Amino acid sequence: MIDFFRSAIAAALASAQLNTAKPIQLEQPADKKFGDFSTNIAMLAAKECGKKPRDLAQEIINHLAFPPDTVAKIEIAGAGFINFYLTPRFIMRSVEQVLRDGEKFGQSTEGNGKKAIVEYVSANPTGPLTIGRGRGGVVGDCIANLLATQGYEVTREYYFNDAGRQMQILGASVRFRYLELCGNTIEFPEDHYQGDYIRDIAATLYEQHGNALEKSEELEPFKKAAEELIFKSIKATLERLNIRHDSFFNEHKLYLANNNSPSANTAVIQSLSSSNFIDDYDGATWFLTTKLGQEKDKVLIKSTGEPSYRLPDIAYHVNKFQRGFDLMVNVFGADHIDEYPDVLEALKILGYDTTKVHVAINQFVTTTVNGQTVKMSTRKGNADLLDDLIADVGADATRLFFITRSKDSHLNFDVELAKRQSKENPVFYLQYAHARICSLLRLAKQEVGFDADTYGFADVLQVLDGAAEVQLGFALLNFPAMIQSSLRLLEPQKMVEYLHALAEHFHRFYQESPILKAEPEVRTARLLLSVATRQVLRNGFTILGISAPEAM
């Protein structure tokens, strides 16, 4: 709908021979007394067009052309806002588009021919997934779903490192537990991985090999077994949460030279050095970020010879550019806040278009269980595990609760609320709206022979003009714009808020508008409005990755 009015305003400007490069922005005023839509284009373009804002607004209005029964009135407000008030007939006629498009309603071709990559979860295989990683997984999965609705060819990638110091500690942790099973008394190091999963991996090795590995000083068999079993566990956990990946990228690839070419990490150092942004001092290799106005330079290679996180991250992004992606989205935890700006600066120096790179930082999660907050730690036996949460509250509640708050905000996950069967529970409230519509349609088929799958809808909805009906219809039409807004902000929470408001509109409509007992013409229109609402709820649930139950 927004595109319809944007095109009409652009046509009015052209008809009035008013040329402007300013974008035509349309917003929905919070207060309906200012209209259904409002634009500030007259204020933005006034100077460029050589006119006062209110005079330009009037000239635009004079050249606007709409089909009959589209706009009830147009007003100029304040310094030059143009406010549009739509007719109920236009709104309800537009709802027919929902019924025509079905599951494709809200989709666009904006991303057709473009490749996007979304990197999310990306936990190293050192232990089961924690709840914090789960939040990033859901945020990333929803962003990938949003991109897919806009026509992008989306690659969902998991980036990991199986060669770092933590993996060595993992191997040693398993070896110590294995030696205990062989009858040895071991003083287990405090800084090693302590969870029960380490004992489980050691037990698996003992079942397979008995005491055969007892004398081995090599960590590799222990590390390899741990990596394989933990990755299997991680993938199973993600599958329970309806999260999938198309590609798993091993950081180790960035360390490998190929056909007389340097490794990706070395190539980054060489390129930054040729641009005079590398120096060696204090035994380390530094990225000279002080030349970019920062207080300190940043280490790329430590004095031990190990790279810092920044170097492979830069090389990894170079690899993404080399793979031809038009859009790159990285879903990071809050621990990356200080790092990623340096990665972007390095990419700029290397000549890459960093406007293609978008970063979504999601804050930490704590869970409240029986009034007690449990902290997460992969290395502790009391780790707050994602699997445990899914088993306790279910996949739908887990997914939705992760995105009920902005990704930028710390999330307190109320486990008791997530299990509550009441309207205070957002997942129950949304799914109940869908189930309620399904129940209504089943009853309509039994009592009046209405079949939502076969009923024609042309020019039927226009008989509806009640306040609750029109508000619901208008809310339905906002779905495509909400997809675009959620994607632009990389904020799935906006979609949750929209769907919650839509459910509220439906419940109000259901209470205020008799359906099955209405006159046949009105009854049919109200049933079709319910069908359209069910469709938009389903489409939204698909983006959020939750189920759409037909009965509750």
Curated annotation (Swiss-Prot):
Question: GO MF terms on file?
Answer: arginine-tRNA ligase activity; ATP binding
What subcellular compartments does it reside in? Cytoplasm
GO biological processes: arginyl-tRNA aminoacylation
Catalytic activity annotated for this protein? tRNA(Arg) + L-arginine + ATP = L-arginyl-tRNA(Arg) + AMP + diphosphate
Instruction: Return the GO cellular component terms, semicolon-separated.
Output: cytoplasm
Q: Where along the sequence does the record place the motif called 'HIGH' region?
A: 123-133
Q: What is its EC number?
A: 6.1.1.19
Task: Respond yes or no to whether keyword ATP-binding is given for this record.
Answer: yes
Q: What is its main location?
A: cytoplasm
Keywords in alphabetical order, please: Aminoacyl-tRNA synthetase, ATP-binding, Cytoplasm, Ligase, Nucleotide-binding, Protein biosynthesis
Question: Does the record's keyword annotation contain ATP-binding?
Answer: yes
Which NCBIfam families has this protein been placed in?
Answer: argS (TIGR00456)
Assembly description? Monomer.
Q: Of which family is this protein a member? A: Belongs to the class-I aminoacyl-tRNA synthetase family.
Instruction: Kindly provide the name given to this protein in its UniProt entry.
Output: Arginine--tRNA ligase
Query: Which organism is the protein's source?
Result: Chlorobium chlorochromatii (strain CaD3)
Species classification = Bacteria, Pseudomonadati, Chlorobiota, Chlorobiia, Chlorobiales
